[in-house]
From Swiss-Prot:
Domain of life the protein comes from: Bacteria
InterPro entries: Asp_de-COase-like_dom_sf, Asp_decarbox
Sequence positions that bind substrate: 57, 73-75
Protein name, entry field: Aspartate 1-decarboxylase
Function: Catalyzes the pyruvoyl-dependent decarboxylation of aspartate to produce beta-alanine.
EC number: 4.1.1.11
GO cellular component assignments: cytosol
Main location: cytoplasm
Cofactor binding note: Binds 1 pyruvoyl group covalently per subunit.
Amino acid sequence: MHAIMLKAKLHRAEVTHSVLDYEGSCAIDGEWLDLAGIHEYEQIQIYNVDNGERFTTYAIRAEDGSKMISVNGAAAHKAQKGDRVIICAYAHYSEAELATHKPRMLYMAPGNVLSHTSNAIPVQVA
């Protein structure tokens, strides 16, 4: 049996560019890609916190240290500059891999400042 699990997440990153006339994709600060373990051209899901849009695209590398999140091509209709987004990558894991799997999560503060990283989401309480 295999399960599709969260591999990596950038939580509440701010869209810095929305470029309609660009080949499709999402450019992400290269340092963040490395920290999250997301590969260039890897499929990602983007969830727009501000307007509720959810869409699929792929990651491309932006300049290291740029703090860039650029939503490009047709996806630019779904996210505008200033929108807060959650970017996720998922992967298939075997039963054996599930026992030790931990996602890589990057949490962003305003201005796309990396606040902290984690490999677990706290238990939600009432």
